[in-house]
Amino acid sequence: MGEMEIEEIEAVLEKIWDLHDKLSDEIHLISKSHFLKSVKPSNRSEKRKNPHGNSGEDKRPGYVFIKGFAVDDNDSTIQEAKSLNAIRTALENLEDQLEFFHTIHTQQRTEKDVAIARLEQSRILLAMRLAEHHGKNYGVLEEALAFVGSIKSNSHYVSPDHLYDSSRNPDGANSIPDGIESNFVINAFASTFGFAKRALGFNHVKGVLGNAAIFAISVVAMLHLHQVATSEHHLQKKEDRFYRSQQRKTYGRDKSSADRSLDHLDVMMARG
C-alpha cells in the first residue's frame, strides 16, 4: 500500500464504509424481493387442481430465514446474495486491518511529535544559555550559536550575532533586554502550544475542554523550562555579586595602601 498519511487512511475508511452500506442495501433488496416471491400465494386454479397437494413442496424457499421455509442453494438469486455477502465480509476484513494500521500510525506520529517537541525545547534552552553567556566571546560559542540557529522574537528572528554582540552592556557583560525576553517567552509558549496540540492529536478537537487540555500541557512544559532558566539565572546573579564583592575588597585594600603611602610622603616632605 505504501506510505500513507493519516488523512489518506481516514479517506479510505470513509470509502469502505460507504461501499459497505451500499452492499448491505443491495443484499437487503435481494433478500426482500426473494422473500416476497416465496410467500406469494398461488392462484386459485392451481389450488382447485391439487387441493390435497403437498404444501411443503409448493412453497418456494426464501433467502431470509423464516421458520417453515427452506433455502434453495441452487437458486440464482440466492447465489447472487451469497456472493455479495462474501464481498461484504472481505470488505469488513479490509476495514479491520486498515483501522489497526490507522491506530498504529497515529501512535507513531504522536510519539514522533512528542520527541520533536522535546527536541525543540532543548534547542531553545541551549540557545538561551549561549545568549546569556557572561565573559569572553569564545569562537566555539559563536560556532555553537550558528549551529543551534536563531530564536524567534518580535522581529521574526534574532540572529546569533545579534543575541551575542548587541546585548553587551558597557561593563562587558551580556544581558537580554526585557522586550526580547518577554517576546521570547511568548513565542516559546506558542511553539510549545502548537507542538502539544499536534502531539496529542487535537487537530480536530474543538470546544472548551480540548483547548483547556492543550493549554494546561503547554503551561506545564513552559513552567518546567522557566524553572530551569530561573535557577540558572539566580546562580549567575550570585556569582556576579560574589565577583563584585571581591573586586570592591581588592580595590579598597589597594586604595587604603595608596593613601597611607601618600600620607607618609607628605609627612616626610613637611619635615623638609
Curated annotation (Swiss-Prot):
It comes from the Eukaryota. Its main location: plastid. Residues 78-102 form a coiled coil. The keyword Transmembrane applies. Residues 226-272 are chloroplast intermembrane. Component of the plastid division machinery. Required to mediate the dissociation of ARC5/DRP5B from plastid outer envelope membranes (OEMs) at the midplastid constriction site in the cytoplasm, thus triggering ARC5/DRP5B ring turnover at the chloroplast division site. Binding to phosphatidylinositol 4-phosphate (PI4P) modulates negatively chloroplast division. This is Plastid division protein PDV1. It comes from Arabidopsis thaliana (Mouse-ear cress). The lineage of its organism: Eukaryota, Viridiplantae, Streptophyta, Embryophyta, Tracheophyta. The gene is PDV1.
